[in-house]
Amino acid sequence: MSGMTEVSSLTGRLLVATPALADPNFDRAVVLLLDHDEEGSLGVVLNRPTPVDVSDILEGWADLAGEPGVVFQGGPVSLDSALGVAVIPGGASVDGAPLGWRRVHGAIGLVDLEAPPELLAKALGSLRIFAGYAGWGPGQLEDELVEGAWYVVESEPGDVSSPSPERLWREVLRRQRNELAMVATYPDDPSLN
């Protein structure tokens, strides 16, 4: 992160797709940015559950995965790879991170899925498994922000494990204390308005 100050890094924030974003991969997407620096950005889409059960691909982690217990499509890149994102209760204030968990922002962190699940079982509050991720090259995300493709908002630990991922886009917008709250009422198909 040599060229970026902590203030300008968007790591840990949410990218919320604007209604104008035309890419079907990101229609009404809520992306948690796991890394953002001068080399590019990486995140996972929090609101794209798949019909695949976690137990079908990562049996040992199934008991730790929160409801609905399915794999989420994290984005269009590397769909054959899995990422684990978990919230540690009290994680923002906990000094020592549990072995196998690396803090991204506050109580949210990445889980080493190669580690034995029992190593983290007592420490994890909620876990989501993502197939693939969303990635941007150097400056690409910044260009999309200038073009108005994304709203940038603060994340909350509960966003990772929302029990209603299909409502997350509206819920995140609705909690904003500015004009973004009104965007939550935007119709799914504006031509029917």
From Swiss-Prot:
Gene Ontology cellular component terms for the protein in this record: cytosol
Pfam family, one: DUF179
Superkingdom as given in the UniProt entry: Bacteria
Entry's family note: Belongs to the UPF0301 (AlgH) family.
Name of the molecule in the record: UPF0301 protein SAV_5129
Classification of source organism: Bacteria, Bacillati, Actinomycetota, Actinomycetes, Kitasatosporales
